[in-house]
Regions:
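Acidic, Gly/Ser/Thr-rich repeat motifs that build Ca2+-stabilized beta-propeller blades
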Residues: 24-29, 34-201, 249, 257-260, ...
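Secondary-structure boundary elements
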Residues: 184-190, 217-232, 251-257
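Beta-propeller blade signature
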Residues: 142-153, 207-220, 274-275
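Surface-exposed loop and turn segments in beta-propeller and other repeat-based domains
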Residues: 92-106, 160-178, 219-240, 282-313
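Repeat-solenoid scaffold signature
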Residues: 235-270
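C-terminal motif of bacterial Sec signal peptides marking the signal peptidase cleavage site
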Residues: 20-22
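Bacterial N-terminal signal peptides that target proteins for export
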Residues: 2-12
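Conserved blade-ending motifs and adjacent loop-strand segments that build the rim/top face
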Residues: 244, 355-375
């Protein structure tokens, strides 16, 4: 039995920090000018972390650091995007964003950059975005677009030439389980996209569509050569793996292995090694049960389906995760940190001889949507919901 360290992080804020947290943004339009954040936010120490705030946001969903810069770009579900220069504390807006189908779990989704385009500023680099797109007859689906990020001033950037390069197929009714997380292979030859089951379940076992799959594409969104179902034609030729439910984390580790983190039903959240041609079993098997308490056979009953590396019952409701590549947190290097929504926690995972173990859980007062590692090794964490804050975590002194 693994003994877990568990910490309660009391988020007691100084007056200066409370003032910073009160600086919100308008909820509509992509041309609103946010108030600047304080340039030197005051740190609060708690548990193993020292925390500073870098602004608050309107339903933040994803964040990415423009490689080689100090700017973190943050998507907001209603269809807006902001950025923070963490070296100065200044906040800025991004224009040129797509129309999104906002509602339920849908809206503006992930944001990603290419590491090979690292520079000292964020001007003139490729930006990838995902979002929920409306279709005919009350249908909708996830899409991925690509454009150029141009920053004309310290507080303003725009996305130019944005075009959709991939669409989830087919569009269906409902506003859940888009997934639409983005990851690039370490050599930057391939674009991987998590495509959720859209709460329709059975299509995740039907390889004639891309619901409940991870797709592998060229950087321009066309199907990559060598995919396992290429002979079946479009859209099956996009599929890398299937039998997924609702993936909210998609990351490569330092060895080049792709992992996904996904929501189970009632129980059965999963961390999976994503492998070519693997079927992860949803909805035929799960280590959880249906919301109406009907049982689902677990993975042990059907060995032809790929079992998770680790699962959680009760659920943690993951928002995202990141691998720890820096040395700032000492022997945590090579481990992973998960942002928990329902669990309101950061979950520390270790990798031991091919096994994944939960090493510790650090409780917060709010749902956590996103976590990423900065170039200096600090963790940047986004709280979920309206007014969700961006928190920078370093080891407590």
């Amino acid at each position: 039995m693994i003994m877990l360290k568990k910490y309660r992080l009391a988020l007691i804020l100084s007056p200066a920090t409370l003032a910073l947290a009160s600086c919100g943004y308008a909820t509509s339009g992509d041309s609103e000018t946010p108030s600047p954040a304080a340039s030197s936010p005051e740190a609060t120490q708690m548990g193993p972390f020292s925390m500073t705030e870098h602004g608050s946001f309107n339903e933040p969903w994803a964040a990415a650091i423009a490689p080689g810069s100090d700017r973190i770009f943050i998507t907001e579900k209603p269809g807006t995007m902001k950025f923070v220069d963490v070296s100065t504390g200044k906040l800025g807006t991004v224009t040129g964003l797509p129309d999104v189908d906002y509602g339920g779990q849908g809206g503006l989704g992930d944001v990603a950059f290419l590491e090979s385009e690292a520079g000292n500023d964020a001007t003139g680099r490729t930006i990838y975005l995902s979002w929920a797109e409306a279709g005919d007859n009350n249908t909708r689906g996830a899409v991925v677009g690509r454009g150029q990020l141009v920053c004309a001033a310290a507080d303003t950037c725009s996305v130019e030439g944005l075009e959709v390069i991939w669409r989830q197929a087919p569009k269906v009714t409902g506003r859940g389980h888009y997934s639409h997380r983005i990851a690039f292979s370490p050599d930057e030859k391939y674009l991987f996209v998590a495509s959720g089951d859209r709460q329709k379940m059975e299509p995740a076992q039907d390889a004639s569509n891309t619901l409940g799959t991870v797709v592998r594409l060229n950087l321009d969104g066309t199907p990559a050569a060598g995919n396992p179902l290429a002979a079946q034609g479009s859209p099956s030729d996009e599929i890398w793996s299937w039998g997924h439910r609702n993936i909210l984390g998609l990351q490569f580790d330092s060895s080049g292995q792709l992992w996904d983190l996904e929501h189970g039903p009632k129980g059965g959240d999963e961390l999976n090694r994503v492998e070519r041609g693997a079927n992860y079993g949803w909805p035929v098997v799960s280590d959880g049960i249906h919301y109406d308490n009907d049982n689902i056979p677990n993975h042990a009953t059907r060995p032809e389906f790929k079992a998770p590396a680790i699962g959680w019952t009760p659920v943690i409701a993951p928002g995202d995760f990141t691998f720890i590549n820096g040395a700032l947190f000492g022997d945590w290097k090579g481990d992973a940190i998960v942002a928990g929504l329902k669990s309101k926690a950061l979950i520390h995972l270790g990798f031991d001889g091919g096994k994944v173990v939960e090493k510790a859980r650090y409780d917060f007062d709010n749902r956590l949507r996103e976590v990423l590692e900065g170039p200096d090794g600090a963790f940047y964490v986004l709280e979920d919901g309206d007014g969700g804050r961006l928190l920078r975590l370093t080891p407590a002194s």
